[in-house]
Amino acid sequence: MGEKAVPLLRRRRVKRSCPSCGPELGVEEKKGKGNPISIQLFPPELVEHIISFLPVRDLVALGQTCRYFHEVCDAEGVWRRICRRLSPRLRDQGSGVRPWKRAAILNYTKGLYFQAFGGRRRCLSKSVAPLLAHGYRRFLPTKDHVFILDYVGTLFFLKNALVSTLGQMQWKRACRYVVLCRGAKDFASDPRCDTVYRKYLYVLATREQQEVVGTTSSRACDCVEVYLQSSGQRVFKMTFHHSMTFKQIVLVGQETQRALLLLTEEGKIYSLVVNETQLDQPRSYTVQLALRKVSHYLPHLRVACMTSNQSSTLYVTDQGGVYFEVHTPGVYRDLFGTLQAFDPLDQQMPLALSLPAKILFCALGYNHLGLVDEFGRIFMQGNNRYGQLGTGDKMDRGEPTQVRYLQRPITLWCGLNHSLVLSQSSEFSKELLGCGCGAGGRLPGWPKGSASFVKLQVKVPLCACALCATRECLYILSSHDIEQHTPYRDLPASRVVGIPEPSLGTGAPQDPGGTAQACEEYLSQIHSCHTLQDRMEKMKEIVGWMPLMAAQKDFFWEALDMLQKAEGGGGGVGPPASET
């Protein structure tokens, strides 16, 4: 029997050493071991090709190990391969300092999550992710569907549909998608919080128009296209002169007098009025585009962004100033507490808000608003009947009032009678805070609401950046753009300690007597309770009312639960249901 030659297979050990640190000495001299191979001996193209197969999360973690892997993992060639794997249809990397890395992260982190307020399931669900979408820039839920705009101007139509799950037919949200249109810049619908009013979708887009009939030459012109939200059918289109370019559109007013506000690239506001009740009729319309009074009487102002509601509009300038338009006396009284300066014959005249610092972004509800300045401070103003201002009480505010226990939010949203704040709780987690009316489950975990911002029972995605709530559902948009960062500044030391903050608009120092009076009232309520258990429950409610941070409230509630159990009360763990 002849011997069969078997080749000797040796496993060679590859040493992952940082080239900047150099190879370790004395390893080759060890007996009984093969010669190690440093990864620095591999060609850079081979190393980039190997690590491009890693998931994005692992690639980022590998880049934090040493200087060599940081440079390799940060190479555009690696991110180009990852981007083409995540979005095979994407061929143009776009613009920017790091276009391929930005595109890859946009497509890796994109996602739309929603949580229904009713029903048994109290967890986030994820909508269908369109393969053609290049990241998610903004979204808008309507009565039946959800619309999403990506970073290349494609507007997607996410439909609700009946699907079969384990042999059972179920109605699911945003589980099918189609492309509504391309070349979109912005879109808007009825600004009211109730989605039942959002019948039409107004899309600001760019289209190629022929310069002269019968010729092949064309030029880009901005236009507004109107679609039915139920079917996605286009019912109306208006085209503007090629010299006018817009970047944002919002709506204000009733259906019969719907005003479209258009923001130009130069920061000017134009408006036109349409009658929505006649849009489904096949006929031609002539509309007049006019300069809004905020740009006509204040031509030096350059508006950076705007937001609207049914009866009011808020403008934020590039210098951080805020100007208001209020069109009804009821909303004006809720926002400012008086009708002294309201002129029913001149509703477009802008009103300037007195603020201590530059405003970065804002949110506008039906009769209250929220502002965030350059130092990350949150200011609330308006009606506070349900505690939607988050000040710890239910007193209306006719001027911006700081919510002192919240800092540097990611985004802010104001609804009909409640408010939501997306906050960064730690480096690797985010939390959702809410205040106001909790009826219908709109504040998960707080069925009877809260007069101060409390942590909601919602598992927030790591890259959450925007949110919106309807009567039936909470929506959270996930996306991360490496080129966009909120430029918060550190508050000067003179404003932190030692010097009382002046009251906004009046210049008078704030009176802390309101807090002392509230504490006396709380003690009076505790004293009126007859048993220790009743006093414990009342103290839990008071903790929910007080303007404390979410972690502080959790601490006090946990401590009160421990004391209550020690006395034999056996109270349930968790926050109480405070009155609205």
Curated annotation (Swiss-Prot):
Keywords, in A-Z order: Ubl conjugation pathway
Official protein name in the record: F-box only protein 24
Q: What does this protein do?
A: Substrate-recognition component of the SCF (SKP1-CUL1-F-box protein)-type E3 ubiquitin ligase complex.
Q: Where is the F-box domain?
A: 36-82
RCC repeat positions in this chain? 376-425
Query: What does the subunit comment say?
Result: Directly interacts with SKP1 and CUL1.
Superkingdom: Eukaryota
A Pfam family found in this protein is F-box-like
